UniProtKB/Swiss-Prot annotation:
The organism of origin for this protein: Protochlamydia amoebophila (strain UWE25)
Known catalytic reactions: guanosine(46) in tRNA + S-adenosyl-L-methionine = N(7)-methylguanosine(46) in tRNA + S-adenosyl-L-homocysteine
Coiled coil ranges: none
Record family assignment: Belongs to the class I-like SAM-binding methyltransferase superfamily. TrmB family.
One Pfam assignment: Methyltransf_4
Binding positions (S-adenosyl-L-methionine): 56, 81, 108, 131
Job description of the protein: Catalyzes the formation of N(7)-methylguanine at position 46 (m7G46) in tRNA.
Documented EC number(s): 2.1.1.33
Keyword set includes Glycoprotein: no
Name of the protein in its database record: tRNA (guanine-N(7)-)-methyltransferase
Keyword annotations: Methyltransferase, S-adenosyl-L-methionine, Transferase, tRNA processing
Alphabetical list of SUPFAM superfamilies matching this protein: S-adenosyl-L-methionine-dependent methyltransferases
Amino acid sequence: MKPKDLKSPFKWEHRQIVIQDRVWYVPDQHLSDIPFIFPGWTHDQTFAQDKPIYLEYCSGNGAWIASKAIEQSQYNWVGIEKKFDRTRKIWSKIKKFELDNLLTICGEGFHVTRDFFANESVDAVFINFPDPWPKKRHAKHRIVQPAFVKEIHRILKSDKLFTLVTDDAAYSKIMIDVIYQTGGFISLFEAPYYTTSYPGYGSSYFEELWREKGKSIHYHVFRKI
């Protein structure tokens, strides 16, 4: 099925939180009179099978997470992407490859995490090529903020890994600083706390794009302590 085949289950003036056809919609407001109750990860609406949850933020068009769901079917994969046009592309891949171990969430990462993920419920977290918002006046829009890192620490199981990937050297340093200042994590790499070679990690649209432009990719891996 093509991305355009996915239609929103509600009109904007009647937006609501709903899980439908491998997509979990989390708009900025829930305007239904019926409260949303998350059914759990083993419900038919989500995964049915009880497997470790691997969570990706900034999923983009879904190339990375779809390939991971195919290669590593022993995990349940969740991709969070706030833009509906990109969510459609992830959904299209779910349908094309019949991925019953991949669910996409269309919503804002921090609020979705805070409102719907239980303590120590996730086995791995990935953030691939988040928008660096390089201008100082836009810094508040960056996903890697102290409050967000605290939420990742809360939902991640003990000793599990938090991986971040960027092509932006300045943002790499910012993310490292935020994580260490927030606390609760330790890098798997010695200073400068990243590697530019991480075989087997997988590729995405942005990774291929920036490599073609000659950019170096920074991989950061932190363990929850």
